[in-house]
Amino acid sequence: MQRFTDFYAAMHGGSSVTPTGLGYIPMVIEQSGRGERAYDIYSRLLRERLIFLVGPVNDNTANLVVAQLLFLESENPDKDISFYINSPGGSVYAGMAIYDTMQFIKPDVSTLCTGLAASMGAFLLAAGKKGKRFTLPNSRIMIHQPSGGAQGQASDIQIQAREILDLRERLNRILAENTGQPVERIAVDTERDNFMSAEDAVSYGLVDKVLTSRAQT
């Protein structure tokens, strides 16, 4: 997955973009009887139960997403959470931390692709509550097998190879469950980078609906 993340960074000037890493984050001023209060835009949207994954999946972004999921569950365990994804993917381990938390908490997590959901980004997109997984019409979704490198003694390389194969089998099995596709087809379709349009992603079972307006939600 690192290979595609590097390509994504090159297409964006060599830098990764996350909500916490932007040079400028808009502020929202709210007025009440107690006076004015300023929020950064992402904190304000968190109050509306919106979470964003923007840029590569790594330990830092996973930690932020997991913390927000747990916080929103504690605020209201019966109200849906909306998870907006625009990500080229990244670390399988970090992504699985997000995935497991999505399944662990009580609220339904609705997912929406805005731009790109590739690799682990696509995996998390498909992990939303069935019937509540969406994409915008010009988004792109890409699935592929996990990748990684190893160095050291032959025994060390063998251990890493077994781990990658185990991860591939685990990811394929979960993706098959979430899409309704046979695991054998998942294995074939993820052999190389497999890009899909929004409509193709619906047909494949990665998402449930293409949204063109807010009224459709």
From Swiss-Prot:
UniProt keyword annotation of Membrane present: no
One Gene Ontology term from the biological process aspect of the record: protein quality control for misfolded or incompletely synthesized proteins
InterPro entries: ClpP, ClpP/crotonase-like_dom_sf, ClpP/TepA, ClpP_His_AS
Active-site residues annotated for this sequence: 119 (nucleophile), 144
Cytoplasm recorded as keyword: yes
Broad class of where this protein is predominantly found: cytoplasm
Catalytic activities: Hydrolysis of proteins to small peptides in the presence of ATP and magnesium. alpha-casein is the usual test substrate. In the absence of ATP, only oligopeptides shorter than five residues are hydrolyzed (such as succinyl-Leu-Tyr-|-NHMec, and Leu-Tyr-Leu-|-Tyr-Trp, in which cleavage of the -Tyr-|-Leu- and -Tyr-|-Trp bonds also occurs)
Keywords, sorted A to Z: Cytoplasm, Hydrolase, Protease, Serine protease
Single GO term (MF): ATP-dependent peptidase activity
GO CC list: cytoplasm; endopeptidase Clp complex
Cellular localisation: Cytoplasm
Record-listed E.C. numbers: 3.4.21.92
HAMAP family: ClpP
Its job: Cleaves peptides in various proteins in a process that requires ATP hydrolysis. Has a chymotrypsin-like activity. Plays a major role in the degradation of misfolded proteins.
Subunit comment: Fourteen ClpP subunits assemble into 2 heptameric rings which stack back to back to give a disk-like structure with a central cavity, resembling the structure of eukaryotic proteasomes.
Family from the record: Belongs to the peptidase S14 family.
UniProt-listed NCBIfam families: clpP, PRK00277.1, PRK12553.1
Protein name: ATP-dependent Clp protease proteolytic subunit
Organism placement in taxonomy: Bacteria, Pseudomonadati, Pseudomonadota, Betaproteobacteria, Burkholderiales
